[in-house]
């Protein structure tokens, strides 16, 4: 049978482990090698301490306490406190908007009775009555007038032991401190044209941003830090704030070392990453109420942006890893809403974005070290998707969100439509965020993560800003480009090739002749005959077989067989120590993994549907272990795979491992299996449907889950190539004998070929539907 190819891959998985072990032993051998390091030895051999090298930071850190500055006249910035620090009594500060506000602050020493003093305010001698009854604290008096020729009136006062005062322009008002330290507070009064109000300070002062107002209040009430009260702190002119510093640019090329032929250049670059997710939404056959798969797919995106006045053309490829499989089963009826599998990314998942642009930094990305990157986080939120049912209200999957956090960067090779490019692969870890996702009109709600159904939420792209730095070994002559090659750190990304190959494979389903397929399904396909249609296969048959087995041993099928083998081994050892096979939950637990469910069977249809669906997913393994003479689903899928490989124009040695592994997992996702007991047949499918019926009349009988599980343990499991609905339709329209019924139930290939040669439309339609399910 054609399914021999899958059996060979499963049976020979140990040879891959042995090959890896021999290879590791070879690596472990050591030799004494004398190395003569040249000027660029560190590029061939990793430095002792790997680090990012020089990464320039363009972030300006604003100090909390800026100053002290010398007395001056200037227009202070809005939302900044002027912290005034006078040494002697007298005029501290004056300011005006030259329209309707003239204000001044004077300082009075302790122990002053009411007296009239003369102050020069705005160039005019003013007589001001002042007093300070405190014996220890200095008194700041805030004065104000509204016309140039008017008289000053007292607005507020501040009794201060530290001898500090503050003033600020904010929100259309002029703010000052009042009250008494250490409990001084702020107060403000409306000032028109306040942002153009100029100040003249007659003492040293500091500048503090408003977002640090709590610190400013702390200074007003308790004094400046001790370091500010030493003679080592010298006030400077306010003009020093306008000094232009020659800072290193974020986007620059630094030559680290150079010889006649080669040089090391550090590239520091700003980067704007734009990416989008792609997905595949596949409906099952039938009446239109069921979806077989909603999954993430790699997505390419090309765009332009400006970096330091230069227009950059960039290309990204987004892919995901570590997806979580969810499903929803609304029931066993043909009109029940079902999603067999939909993918969700969450905390245990990763998102990969390959980035390349046409700048100088990517011209020689071959010999690279000290690669590092700093990227912002980005929130990805899911949108709505309507499941368009033929009749009734449509369920809607809505919501879901994840935050992407930069988790690393490495080299990779990115494939565009025309050329492969050495690029950077950014890895992002995920955290689940609000909102949760749900499916309306179902019980699926309050689940966290980002489902694949509408991950872009109708956006064109997601965007991440950041920067990266790398040191590259490049030719000293800038006109010469390093020969394109892939270093050992570069991972070959085949997703683009595989995507095109999948499209071609799925289109070839229409070109397969059913009669030839049955004949091919009966042939014992081995690895050599499977690969015989691929160009250059014979020259690399050994390495290809090894690569296929390496990939195949990581498949879900191989993992399930491995788990099943361990379970059976444990069950066998337990039986030898127990008098009853039921004491280890019987062999059913090893085959079906539902022994706990069988002990408490509910009579509801949904419960039976769930149990039979769980059992039927494991029946493929039982069928592989107990080969019968009938044809099975794997024979058909292997025959379709062989036919498509022979017809494909894009199949190659480097993508055949992915194709075979994916075919073993995804070909014919909707399968039904049956067991026969005398005249009774029990049939269950992976989508939860189940039937029990008589062979002669095809009359349905009650489905006994416990008996079905017992028969699965003791009887051969048969692929329902011609399922119950097709058999009943065939009998109602054409009439079949009891012997023909038994042969079709056993999936006898001889009888199948007879019906196909007779051009029976019901049987042909069933086989065609199976072929259409052979999709990548």
Swiss-Prot record:
A motif (KID motif) lies at residues 644-646. Residues 248-479 are annotated as: Spike body and stalk (antigen domain). Residues 510-776 are annotated as: Spike foot. The keyword NAD does not apply. Pfam families: Rota_VP4_MID (PF17477), VP4_haemagglut (PF00426), VP4_helical (PF17478). GO terms for biological process: permeabilization of host organelle membrane involved in viral entry into host cell; virion attachment to host cell. Residues 65-224 are annotated as: Spike head. In group A rotaviruses, VP4 defines the P serotype. This is Outer capsid protein VP4. It comes from Rotavirus A (isolate RVA/Equine/Japan/HO-5/1980/G3P[X]).
């Amino acid at each position: 049978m054609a399914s021999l190819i899958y059996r060979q891959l499963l049976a020979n998985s140990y040879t891959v482990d042995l090959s890896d072990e021999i290879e590791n032993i070879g690596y472990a051998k050591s030799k004494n090698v004398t190395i003569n390091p040249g000027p660029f030895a560190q590029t061939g051999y990793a430095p002792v301490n790997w680090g990012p090298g020089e990464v320039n930071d363009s972030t300006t850190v604003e100090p909390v306490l800026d100053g002290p500055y010398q007395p001056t006249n200037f227009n202070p910035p809005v939302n900044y406190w002027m912290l005034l620090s006078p040494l002697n009594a007298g005029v501290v500060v004056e300011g005006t908007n030259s329209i309707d506000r003239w204000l001044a602050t004077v300082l009075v020493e302790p122990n002053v009775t009411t007296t009239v003093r003369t102050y020069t305010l705005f160039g005019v001698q003013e007589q001001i009555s002042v007093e300070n009854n405190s014996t220890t604290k200095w008194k700041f008096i805030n004065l104000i007038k509204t016309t140039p020729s008017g008289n000053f009136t007292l607005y507020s006062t501040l009794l201060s032991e530290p001898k500090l005062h503050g003033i600020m322009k904010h929100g259309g008002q002029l703010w000052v401190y009042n009250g008494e330290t250490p409990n001084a507070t702020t107060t403000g009064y409306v000032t028109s044209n306040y942002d153009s109000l100029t100040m003249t300070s007659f003492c040293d002062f500091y500048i503090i941003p408003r977002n640090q107002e709590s610190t400013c209040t702390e200074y007003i009430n308790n004094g400046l830090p001790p370091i500010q009260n030493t003679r080592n702190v010298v006030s400077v002119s306010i003009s020093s704030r306008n000094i232009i510093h020659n800072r290193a640019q974020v986007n620059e090329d630094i030559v680290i070392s150079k010889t006649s032929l080669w040089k090391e250049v550090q590239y520091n670059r700003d980067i704007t990453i734009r990416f989008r997710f792609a997905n595949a939404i596949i409906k099952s056959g039938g009446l239109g109420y069921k979806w077989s798969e909603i999954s993430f797919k790699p997505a390419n995106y090309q765009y332009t942006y400006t970096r330091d006045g230069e227009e950059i053309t960039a290309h990204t490829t987004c892919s995901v890893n570590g997806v979580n499989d969810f499903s929803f089963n609304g029931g066993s009826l043909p009109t029940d809403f079902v999603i067999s599998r939909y993918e969700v990314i969450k905390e245990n998942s990763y998102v990969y974005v390959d980035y390349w642009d046409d700048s100088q930094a990517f011209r020689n990305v071959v010999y690279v070290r000290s690669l590092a990157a700093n990227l912002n986080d980005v929130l990805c939120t899911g949108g709505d998707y309507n499941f368009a049912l033929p009749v009734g209200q449509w369920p809607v999957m809505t919501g879901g969100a994840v935050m992407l956090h930069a988790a690393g960067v490495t080299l990779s090779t990115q494939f565009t439509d025309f050329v492969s490019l050495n690029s950077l692969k950014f890895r992002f870890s995920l955290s689940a965020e609000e909102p949760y996702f749900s499916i309306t009109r179902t019980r699926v709600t309050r689940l966290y993560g980002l489902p694949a159904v509408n991950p872009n939420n109708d956006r064109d792209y997601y965007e991440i800003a950041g920067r990266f730095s790398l040191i590259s070994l490049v030719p000293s002559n800038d006109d010469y480009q390093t020969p394109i090659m892939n270093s050992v750190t570069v991972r070959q990304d085949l997703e683009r090739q595989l995507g095109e190959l999948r499209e071609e494979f799925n289109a070839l389903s229409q070109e397969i002749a059913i009669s030839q397929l049955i004949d091919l399904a009966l042939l014992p396909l081995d690895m050599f005959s499977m690969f015989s249609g691929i160009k250059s296969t014979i020259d690399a048959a050994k390495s290809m077989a090894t690569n296929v087995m390496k990939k195949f041993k990581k498949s879900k099928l191989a993992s399930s067989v491995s788990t099943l083998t361990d379970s059976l081994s444990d069950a066998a050892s337990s039986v030898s120590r127990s008098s009853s096979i039921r004491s280890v939950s019987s062999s059913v637990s090893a085959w079906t993994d539902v022994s706990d469910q069988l002990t408490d069977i509910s009579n509801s249809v949904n419960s039976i549907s769930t149990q039979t669906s769980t059992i039927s997913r494991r029946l493929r393994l039982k069928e592989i272990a107990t080969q019968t003479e009938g044809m099975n689903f794997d024979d058909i899928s292997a025959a379709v795979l062989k036919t498509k490989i022979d017809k494909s124009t894009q199949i190659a040695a480097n993508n055949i491992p992915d194709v075979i592994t994916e075919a073993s997992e995804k070909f014919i996702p909707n399968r039904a299996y049956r067991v026969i007991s005398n005249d009774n047949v029990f049939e269950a499918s992976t989508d939860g449907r189940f039937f029990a019926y008589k062979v002669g009349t095809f009359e349905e009988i009650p489905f006994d889950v416990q008996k079905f599980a017992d028969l699965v343990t003791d009887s051969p499991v048969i692929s329902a190539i011609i399922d119950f609905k097709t058999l009943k339709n065939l009998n109602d329209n054409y009439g079949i004998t009891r012997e023909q019924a038994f042969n079709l139930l056993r999936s006898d290939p001889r009888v199948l070929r007879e019906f196909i040669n007779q051009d029976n439309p019901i049987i042909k339609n069933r086989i065609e539907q199976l072929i259409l399910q052979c999709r990548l």
